[in-house]
């Protein structure tokens, strides 16, 4: 060993070559085996923190998926479309057509995965000359009709990674905003950074109509948040090997990328597509004549829904989606607007119904919350008038319950046992009242 070699030391901890077992040389720097072990511990801790910060619905299935990953899925283990729809029915009211479309798509997605994981003998039995290609889905419907809720409910029951992304933050590569590869990064995080597991997943892209081309005619200026995003999504939707930066590409430009094959990743896109019915009217010539009165609002919505069922790919192109993008999403489903009857059901029937949520909140303070049937109807009518779908329901109930939830924790729990919501409270925007249940009033004999 030369005199120079005897003075080599780790660039991180400063220990000499004689004090460590191994000294690894780099371009102008050295690192010892002890520092390498320390780096591995730090990385393992960061990965654990990342998994712990994920939502419980996304984090819980990870260990179970890892246990079942090595074994191919059999047809008996794949959830049937009826089972998937039944689960959706417990959480989402109405939208039967969209539920059927999603149930069939998820079922076929599982079957593709079962074939890709099967052994060579099994594949031969299934006729490996036929390759099953995926059919991406487009959900079209007004705001607050349940597009995102359908996707979130699917994520709770599926045995594959499921990620939800927002298209409004995406921009073309090189511009301020998120790259399209960040969509795959979310899926990778849900899969606990397991590439093989992420390649089996499903991605829901919300607000996809916001990346529509700003003008039907090409402009001399670049549309970096519209057509540019659609162009960047093309190969990802069809199936390609994408380079995904594990820490995001903008703030850490020199990191090593992870390669993910999107061939078996199912993409579900959703958007409101405001004004699309007008484009269909111009093409079909079924335009309604005359003025719409307030009493005819429901009939107008029905005509709009019927018009959207005549949707063709050329209408989406007219709206601003490029032909290459629409061609990669062959399955299109229209989600109906919510009427008063459906809004009443949404308030009371689902497993996580809004009324049940507030009843549970007040029950924790030993107060029984009761909504009279005509109050439920009044809340649904007001939500229908606001034209924001089911999102208006929570806003209205919050207005009514605000003062009660503010005063209740400070009141004596022995005196307050009931909270009643009436129709007049909803119509007059008055706050709910806390009542003493008759059974809680002490009689002279008991006193």
Swiss-Prot record:
ClpX-type ZB domain: residues covered: 1-51
SMART domains named in the record: AAA (SM00382), ClpB_D2-small (SM01086), zf-C4_ClpX (SM00994)
Listed InterPro entries: AAA+_ATPase, ATP-dep_Clp_protease_ClpX, ATPase_AAA_core, Clp_ATPase_C, Clp_protease_ATP-bd_su_ClpX, ClpX_bact, P-loop_NTPase, Znf_CppX_C4
Single GO molecular function: ATP binding
Listed GO biological process terms: cell division; proteolysis involved in protein catabolic process
Alphabetic keyword roster: ATP-binding, Chaperone, Metal-binding, Nucleotide-binding, Zinc
Matches recorded under PROSITE patterns: CLPX_ZB
GO cellular-component term (any): HslUV protease complex
Chain sites annotated for binding Zn(2+): 10, 13, 32, 35
Binding site for ATP: 142-149
Keyword Acyltransferase part of the UniProt annotation: no
General function of this protein: ATP-dependent specificity component of the Clp protease. It directs the protease to specific substrates. Can perform chaperone functions in the absence of ClpP.
Entry-linked NCBIfam families: clpX, PRK05342.1
HAMAP family given in the database record: ClpX
PANTHER family linked to this entry: ATP-DEPENDENT CLP PROTEASE ATP-BINDING SUBUNIT CLPX-LIKE, MITOCHONDRIAL, ATP-DEPENDENT CLP PROTEASE ATP-BINDING SUBUNIT CLPX-LIKE, MITOCHONDRIAL-RELATED
Similarity remark: Belongs to the ClpX chaperone family.
Oligomer status and interactors: Component of the ClpX-ClpP complex. Forms a hexameric ring that, in the presence of ATP, binds to fourteen ClpP subunits assembled into a disk-like structure with a central cavity, resembling the structure of eukaryotic proteasomes.
Protein name: ATP-dependent Clp protease ATP-binding subunit ClpX
Organism: Acaryochloris marina (strain MBIC 11017)
């Amino acid at each position: 060993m030369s005199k120079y070699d005897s003075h080599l030391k780790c660039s991180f901890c400063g220990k000499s070559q004689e004090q460590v077992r191994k000294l690894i040389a780099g371009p102008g720097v050295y690192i010892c085996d002890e520092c390498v072990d320390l780096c591995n511990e730090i990385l393992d801790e960061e990965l654990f923190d990342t998994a712990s910060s994920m939502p419980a619905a996304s984090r819980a299935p990870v260990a179970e998926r890892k246990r079942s990953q090595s074994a191919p899925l059999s047809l008996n283990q794949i959830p049937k479309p009826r089972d998937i729809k039944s689960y959706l029915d417990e959480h989402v009211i109405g939208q039967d057509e969209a539920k059927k479309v999603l149930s069939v798509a998820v079922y076929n997605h599982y079957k593709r995965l079962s074939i890709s994981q099967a052994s060579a003998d099994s594949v031969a039995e299934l006729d490996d000359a036929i390759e099953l290609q995926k059919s991406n889905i487009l959900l079209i419907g007004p705001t607050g009709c349940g597009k995102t809720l359908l996707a979130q409910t699917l994520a709770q029951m599926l045995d594959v990674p499921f990620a939800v992304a927002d298209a409004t933050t995406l921009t073309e590569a090189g511009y301020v905003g998120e790259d399209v590869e960040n969509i795959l990064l979310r899926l990778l995080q849900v899969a606990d950074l397991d590439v093989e597991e992420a390649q089996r997943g499903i991605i829901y892209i919300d607000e996809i109509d916001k990346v529509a081309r700003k003008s039907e005619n090409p402009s001399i200026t670049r549309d970096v948040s519209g057509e540019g995003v659609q162009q960047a999504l093309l190969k990802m939707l069809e199936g390609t090997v994408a380079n995904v930066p594990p820490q995001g590409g903008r703030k850490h430009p020199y990191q090593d990328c992870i390669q993910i094959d999107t061939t078996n990743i199912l993409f579900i896109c959703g958007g409101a597509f405001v004004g699309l019915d007008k484009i269909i009217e111009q093409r079909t010539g079924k335009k309604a004549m005359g003025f719409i009165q307030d009493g005819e609002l429901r009939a107008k919505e029905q005509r709009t829904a019927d018009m959207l069922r005549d949707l063709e790919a050329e209408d989406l192109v007219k709206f601003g989606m490029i032909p290459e993008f629409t061609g990669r999403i062959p399955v299109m489903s229209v989600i109906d607007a919510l009427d008063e009857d459906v809004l009443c059901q949404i308030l009371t029937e689902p497993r996580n119904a809004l009324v049940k949520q507030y009843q549970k909140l007040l029950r924790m303070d030993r107060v029984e919350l009761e909504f009279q049937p005509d109050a439920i109807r009044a809340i649904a009518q007001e939500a229908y008038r606001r034209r924001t779908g089911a999102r208006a329901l929570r806003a209205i109930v919050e207005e009514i319950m605000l003062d009660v939830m503010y005063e209740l924790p400070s009141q004596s729990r022995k005196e307050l046992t009931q909270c009643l919501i009436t129709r007049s409270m909803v119509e007059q925007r008055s706050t709910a009242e806390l009542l003493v249940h008759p059974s809680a009033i002490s009689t002279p004999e008991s006193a």
